[in-house]
C-alpha cells in the first residue's frame, strides 16, 4: 500500500509542504553566507526529498537517500565546513555583487521556465497504473537484490573509486582548513608582536 494513501485527502497538502521544504532549503543553501547554516539547510533538502520518495512508494530509494545523503554525506559536510568556517564570517546574508545578481537572474529564469513547463503539461492525459501488493513486494525484492548484485559485481570498481573520491575530498578540506588556521595564527602573532611595546 502506498504510504501517501494512508492520509487520503491530505496527500496534496503533504506534497505541498514537502515541496515548500525543498524550495526553502535550497534557497537557504545558496543564499546564506555561513557555510554551517547552508549545510544544515542541505540536510533539510535531502530529508524532504527522501520523504517525497516515501510518498511515491519508492521505499528503497528513500531509505538510501536518508542513509547515504542525510546520514553520511551531509554529516561529513557539516564536520568539514565546521573545520574550515572562519570566525569572522558572522553575517547571515552576504553582500550582493554583480556576479550574484547575474546568477540570481539566471536561476529565476530557469525556475520560471520550469514552472511554465509544469503548468503547460497535460497531466490529465497521464494514466496511473495500479499494481497489486504482491507484485510490488516481489518487484521491490528483485530490485534490491539486483542493485546489490550489480554494486558488488559489475560496478564494484566505480563504487569503490567513488568512496575514495569522497574520502579524498574530506581529507583535502581538513588539510586546507589546517593550513588556513596556521596562516591566521601566524598573522595574529605578527600583529601582536607589532602592537606590543618593546621592552629593553
From Swiss-Prot:
It is an enzyme of class 7 (translocase). The keyword Transport applies. It holds the Pfam family Oxidored_q3. GO terms for molecular function: NADH dehydrogenase (ubiquinone) activity; quinone binding. It catalyses: a plastoquinone + NADH + (n+1) H(+)(in) = a plastoquinol + NAD(+) + n H(+)(out); a plastoquinone + NADPH + (n+1) H(+)(in) = a plastoquinol + NADP(+) + n H(+)(out). Keywords: Chloroplast, Membrane, NAD, NADP, Plastid, Plastoquinone, Quinone, Thylakoid, Translocase, Transmembrane, Transmembrane helix, Transport. It is found in: Plastid, Chloroplast thylakoid membrane. It comes from Physcomitrium patens. Its EC number is 7.1.1.-. It is a multi-pass membrane protein. It comes from the Eukaryota. The gene is ndhG. Belongs to the complex I subunit 6 family. The chain crosses the membrane at residues 13-33, 35-55, 64-84, 102-122, 156-176. Its main location: plastid. GO terms for cellular component: chloroplast thylakoid membrane. NDH is composed of at least 16 different subunits, 5 of which are encoded in the nucleus. This is NAD(P)H-quinone oxidoreductase subunit 6, chloroplastic. NDH shuttles electrons from NAD(P)H:plastoquinone, via FMN and iron-sulfur (Fe-S) centers, to quinones in the photosynthetic chain and possibly in a chloroplast respiratory chain. The immediate electron acceptor for the enzyme in this species is believed to be plastoquinone. Couples the redox reaction to proton translocation, and thus conserves the redox energy in a proton gradient.
Amino acid at each position: 500500500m502506498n504510504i501517501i494513501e494512508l492520509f487520503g485527502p491530505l496527500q496534496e497538502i503533504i506534497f505541498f509542504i514537502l515541496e515548500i521544504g525543498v524550495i526553502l532549503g535550497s534557497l537557504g543553501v545558496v543564499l546564506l553566507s555561513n557555510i554551517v547554516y547552508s549545510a544544515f539547510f542541505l540536510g533539510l533538502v535531502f530529508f524532504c526529498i527522501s520523504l517525497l520518495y516515501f510518498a511515491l512508494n519508492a521505499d528503497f530509494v528513500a531509505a538510501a537517500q536518508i542513509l547515504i545523503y542525510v546520514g553520511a554525506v551531509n554529516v561529513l559536510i557539516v564536520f568539514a565546513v565546521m573545520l574550515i568556517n572562519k570566525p569572522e564570517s558572522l553575517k547571515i546574508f552576504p553582500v550582493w555583487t554583480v556576479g550574484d545578481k547575474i546568477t540570481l537572474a539566471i536561476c529565476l529564469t530557469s525556475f520560471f521556465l520550469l514552472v511554465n513547463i509544469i503548468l503547460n503539461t497535460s497531466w490529465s492525459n497521464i494514466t496511473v497504473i495500479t499494481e497489486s501488493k504482491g507484485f510490488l513486494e516481489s518487484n521491490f525484492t528483485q530490485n534490491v537484490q539486483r542493485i546489490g548484485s550489480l554494486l558488488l559485481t559489475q560496478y564494484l570498481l566505480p563504487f569503490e573509486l567513488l568512496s575514495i573520491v569522497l574520502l579524498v575530498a574530506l581529507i583535502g578540506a581538513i588539510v586546507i582548513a589546517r593550513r588556513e588556521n596556521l596562516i591566521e595564527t601566524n598573522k595574529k602573532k605578527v600583529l601582536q608582536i607589532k602592537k606590543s611595546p618593546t621592552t629593553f
